[in-house]
Amino acid sequence: MIRHIEGSLQAGEHRFALLVSRFNSFITQQLEQGAIDALRRHGAKEEQLHVVHVPGAYEMPLIAQKLARSGNYDAVLCLGAVIRGGTPHFDYVAAEVSKGVAQVSMDTGVPVIFGVLTTDSIEQAIERAGTKAGNKGFDAAMTALEMVQLLRQI
């Protein structure tokens, strides 16, 4: 018989760190609220959620690593917005943040969720922070819930 393993979407007693970029705060505040909403809807209590603000997305991997290694959190959600401008800065930041977040997760075994918007325009970021395209902070929280439960079963 084939065994199927799936993560449930219940917070249980798990603890979550939300790492939120202050840069583009008009977007990241919405991502933060979306993530908190998702976690609370799925049973997380306020004392299970800790929000840490960092200057920008580029600083996320280091702080995510510190949080993941602390043993205090079952998952770390990285929430930010990198919006393309007229210089190659976007490409460097987006690449390094995504690589760094993935590396922290692999090195620590703690789910570190990439909830960083990488968009070509402010309009696209606004759409993904709670308007037309849903709220990617909410989606990141759902991924965190599922990953935490999935890891418990493997």
Swiss-Prot record:
5-amino-6-(D-ribitylamino)uracil binds at residues 23, 57-59, 81-83, 114. Gene3D superfamilies: Lumazine/riboflavin synthase. Pathway: Cofactor biosynthesis; riboflavin biosynthesis; riboflavin from 2-hydroxy-3-oxobutyl phosphate and 5-amino-6-(D-ribitylamino)uracil: step 1/2. It catalyses: (2S)-2-hydroxy-3-oxobutyl phosphate + 5-amino-6-(D-ribitylamino)uracil = 6,7-dimethyl-8-(1-D-ribityl)lumazine + phosphate + 2 H2O + H(+). The active site is at residue 89. The keyword Repressor does not apply. Its EC number is 2.5.1.78. Transmembrane segments: none annotated. It is an enzyme of class 2 (transferase). GO terms for biological process: riboflavin biosynthetic process. CDD domains: Lumazine_synthase-I (cd09209). It holds the Pfam family DMRL_synthase. Keywords: Riboflavin biosynthesis, Transferase. It comes from the Bacteria. GO terms for cellular component: cytosol; riboflavin synthase complex. GO terms for molecular function: 6,7-dimethyl-8-ribityllumazine synthase activity. Catalyzes the formation of 6,7-dimethyl-8-ribityllumazine by condensation of 5-amino-6-(D-ribitylamino)uracil with 3,4-dihydroxy-2-butanone 4-phosphate. This is the penultimate step in the biosynthesis of riboflavin. NCBIfam families: lumazine-synth (TIGR00114), PRK00061.1-4 (NF000812). Belongs to the DMRL synthase family. This is 6,7-dimethyl-8-ribityllumazine synthase. It comes from Acidithiobacillus ferrooxidans (strain ATCC 23270 / DSM 14882 / CIP 104768 / NCIMB 8455) (Ferrobacillus ferrooxidans (strain ATCC 23270)). The lineage of its organism: Bacteria, Pseudomonadati, Pseudomonadota, Acidithiobacillia, Acidithiobacillales. The gene is ribH.
